[in-house]
Amino acid sequence: MAASIAAATASAALQQVVARPAPVAGWLTFGGSGARPGATASTVGPLRASWFAPLAGTVTSQPLVARNVPRKGDTTVYVATSAGFVYALAANGYVRWRVDLGRFVLPACPQVPDGWGVTGTPVIDPATRTLYVVDAFGRLHAFDLATGAERAGWPVVLYRDYRRELVWGAMLLVDGAVYAGTGAYCDLPMEGKLIRVSLADRKVSGWTVVPPELGGGGGIWGWGGVAYSPRRDSLYVVTGNAFEGGTNKGAAFSEAAGYGEHLVELSPGLDVRSSDAPAPTGFTDLDFVGSPVVADPSGCDELIVAQAKNGMFFAWNADDVPSGPAWSLKLQKADPGAPLLTQPTWSSRFRSFYVATASKLVRIRLDAACKPQIAWQTTLGDATLYPSPTVAGGNVWLGLPVKDLSGVAEALLGVDAATGRVKVRRPIQGVSFAPPTVVAGTLFLASMHGLDAGGFPLARGRPASALDAYQSASDAAHRWQSREDGVYSTEDGGRHWHRIYPRYAAQVLRISKTTGLISVGSPATSCGCATRQLWTQNGGKSWRSAVVGQSYTASRGAVYWWTDNTLFLAAPNLRSSTRIAQTEDTIVSGTPVAGGIAALVDRREKAPQVILAQGAGTRLITLPAASPNTVVRTIRGIGGDLVVRGTSVATSTADPARVEWTSKDGGQTWSAPS
């Protein structure tokens, strides 16, 4: 008996070891690590056609890549968009999961075309296999890497005044805490903050850059957010200018009041350890809008480097920040119309920093005496904003948002890190402002039109899929490739392919430039993803297109669809569409009703509205008012009733309250919100 018990115990132990998931590795935070170097030893081989995934919303954050998720040997790419969507994509572009966190539209600040959803790059905790991301309403979410399910007790509210504060930069994960810095919308009044959330108890604490009595301001704007030095166990942020107000006004006004326009070193508990405000040079707007980078050059002191809008590159000795910059360089002319807005990259292999200015890619090399030298400058072309570069192997990679000297626009550039020679120039879909991500020889680049893998969109071939292909007679007639994990379409005989994601299990539209909307069908998946819409208003002479989410519904053979604030009815032959309603605010959802559609309009600080389109008649119905902090999401037919659902985003830190309106007469009248 003892022997059999021992054997059973050994077997159970063996099963435990086998079942333990493989460790998560990859590119888990902005820049590859908390130091924000933006460099990796991984090399990128010859670029080849791969895949292009159209996403709902503009992408300004860096894609993250986790290997061994969801299973050993798998790779998953995580991308967040300004429309408030977070995607988990397989290595072949297949959508594993997607969540909609909502977006905030602020007409006074239209810097991002889709409104404000997720701007800062999320961070991955490999130990708990969790993705942390902040939405536009100041909520820090925790999602299971494999499933997208929210962890128990989350989200946590970081700040409640989401109309004045925004997390611009990347999250940082250090020793059981997540950090996020806040800025504002278009320099609207606010107080910049560094916020800490303890993952063990979800306790929120913060440090204010410039207190209100000094006028506030001091936003933490940089794409890299907060940097971390393991050697000093310190956090580093650089800040924007203080605003005029309180005692900081008149002749006493200073943009460096409080900790405005400073490099600040803080403990993990948010106590200030040291700081410095460099003297202004050029125009006085010395905002730091890149993020600090921690560099560890062999044989030299550890450096903290950052760039300012006036074209200056500063380097501080990490052990002596208060003494001011150890050295500085002027990289471009001080120009308010084309400020230096990018993030530097550090390569220990080449002992060099790489910076994209308003017109050039610059290599700053540290010599044997630890002195900076401009090794080379490669002209790129004039642009207001370049993305930050990434060093992978022997090349520097970055997106090109304007035409370069060869006339190529919207391209991925590969530049020799040693010589500055342009070795690779590949066209991409749309402008890219995010640094490339390189893992295991594959390059992922987020653009204003979606995500490119391998550096450019699908070309000369069909995309890879995890599932077997299925092609209907209609697909063959229109030269479309349909797959169970989505719909792919071609508009040029197969040279390029477009993937169209279904939104609901019961509906999918197949579309093309030549025939418009041509079918409504049932895909074999319940994947909730984005949909590419093309439409014509002149009988097919010209077409417009957009990538949007949750944007159409079919009602007894009629197809209704919407983009932003306009509702359309497709013609019976589906070759054109007619505009049937237009609002001042955003249409977010729709559902079939008798003889037509009920479409939900989100008006943020006002009561939501419902467009009721039935037959030839259209009515605009205003629902009973709810809290101004309510965001409406969906309208659905449930058990014979129509139900509008929303969320109060400032009610509870752990369980945001759901708000509902109900109509029992097909949308004519509505109950007060509950």
Question: Which role does the model predict for each range below?
Answer:
Residues 17-25, 30, 37-59, 66-79, ...:
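Extracytoplasmic/lumenal domain signature
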Residues 420, 490-491, 536-537, 569-571, ...:
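Conserved Ser/Thr-centered positions that define the repeating blades of beta-propeller domains
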Residues 77-79, 132-133, 303-306, 352-355, ...:
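Short beta-strand elements that form the blades of beta-propeller/WD-repeat-like
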Residues 40, 461-501, 506-513:
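N-terminal "mature head" segments of proteins
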Residues 459-464, 495-503, 538-548, 575-583, ...:
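Trp- and S/T/G-rich repeat-edge/linker motifs of beta-rich repeat architectures
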Residues 1-13:
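Secretory targeting and sorting signals
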Residues 61, 120, 164-169, 224, ...:
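Repeated scaffold domains used in trafficking and secretory/extracellular systems
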